[in-house]
Amino acid sequence: MEKINFGPMLNAYPDSLGGTLSDAVELLKDEPVKGAFSSFYILPSLFNTDLDRGFSVIDYGINGVIAKAEDLSALQAMGVDLKLDIILNHMSVQSPQFQDLLQKGDASEYKDFFIDWNKFWEGCGNIDEEGVLVPRQEYIKDMFFRKPGLPVLVVEFADGTKRPYWNTFYQQVDVDGNGRKHYLGQMDLNINSPLVKEFYQQTLKTLAGYGAKIVRLDAFAYAPKEVGAKNFLNDPGTWDFLQELTDMAQPYGMALLPEIHASYEEGIYLSLIHI
């Protein structure tokens, strides 16, 4: 792992210090501020996103409205280390992968990229009147759902068939004047899919190309899911997943910073010592 500057870190959205990342760069060059920060955590509206102030990623290209690659190069030239996000648990409904799935259904190469709710829980419950499999209580009693009801978004494919997908966070469904449904939301990724693993690898490579020295693992604890286990900080799945990500990041010398949703007193950080 490359040496990281453990001095003061600036945390900011790319458009929150003057409107663009270029404005933030100019601020950091200004004499009263110059040298004050060793690193800069640029929050993920740096990328192409649509919701949740950047945490609903369409793709990891740079959002040209508020930032450009030259801004990142300028920060590195100033000796400011970059901290960037990879959002592990979910992607935007507007992502190319989910849009391909909506159009092609089972013919899509991304049919296993997201979590087919009914397939995940097959044999563990009964289908309700909406076509959603309701798991028996024994399977979900230890699970943490962030909103009332089951965490699903039922989507309609281009051929008219419907299917529920795991949706931990935001969702919205609008119907236009022609009766067509339009979706917004953050769809959970199937971390066991080879294509998702490939996507993680490519994203880490992209972030390294941007100059990231530190990568924050957003929604890390929600991503590993297993029938009969917790869906949040499950053990050992959470730590196996972290090791896998660590191995992916190793060629780039980046430090990984997992988002851990727990108080310091719980000592979960101790589980990271073996990594």
Show where each model-derived region lies:
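An active-site-proximal structural segment forming one wall of the substrate-binding cleft
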Residues: L195-I214
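Acidic/aromatic-lined carbohydrate-recognition and catalytic surfaces
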Residues: E2-L195, K205, F220-L272
